[in-house]
């Protein structure tokens, strides 16, 4: 399956939030609160995955990945500054990959709100940003993916690149 995106591909808790929002909407809930979905997901429902990452041929392994969006822009999800240094208009045509990993629920909940000011990157033990022309992310189990806010279910791997 090949899909194009303008801003970002989200894999992890953001994909879960889009999936749960779609489920609630289908059940007739017209007022979807993504903040509540995220908190409830982080505390009770979403389980982090392990990931194999490839950025321009360099390989990395991560445990307990909560969030791994590949971004063309820097903002997504209602004002989160996922990749503060990302410039979608730069001549180098790089994408950025945010990796939020390695923490338990409480630490994740403590750090997560700082994403709205782009300050989550001040936690290098749990948050990394990698840049490259081609990014491949493979998780140890299928989960929901969001592409510019639209949900795609049961995805285990994705590759992002600029044409």
Where are these regions (language model features)?
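Long C-terminal subdomains/extensions of small-metabolite kinases
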Residues: 1-163
């Amino acid at each position: 399956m090949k899909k194009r995106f303008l801003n970002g591909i989200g894999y992890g808790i953001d994909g879960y939030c889009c999936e749960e929002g779609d489920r609630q909407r289908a059940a007739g809930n017209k007022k979807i609160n993504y903040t509540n979905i995220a908190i409830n997901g982080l505390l009770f429902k979403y389980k982090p995955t392990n990931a194999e990452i490839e950025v321009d041929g360099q390989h990395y392994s991560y445990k307990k990945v909560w969030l791994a969006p590949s971004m063309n822009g820097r903002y997504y999800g209602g004002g989160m500054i996922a990749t503060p240094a990302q410039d979608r208009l730069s001549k180098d045509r790089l994408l950025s990959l945010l990796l939020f990993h390695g923490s338990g629920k409480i630490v994740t909940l403590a750090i997560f709100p700082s994403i709205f000011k782009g300050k989550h990157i001040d936690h290098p033990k749990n948050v990394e940003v990698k840049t490259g022309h081609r990014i491949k992310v493979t998780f140890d189990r299928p989960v929901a993916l969001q592409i510019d806010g639209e949900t795609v279910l049961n995805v285990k791997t994705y590759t992002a690149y600029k044409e």
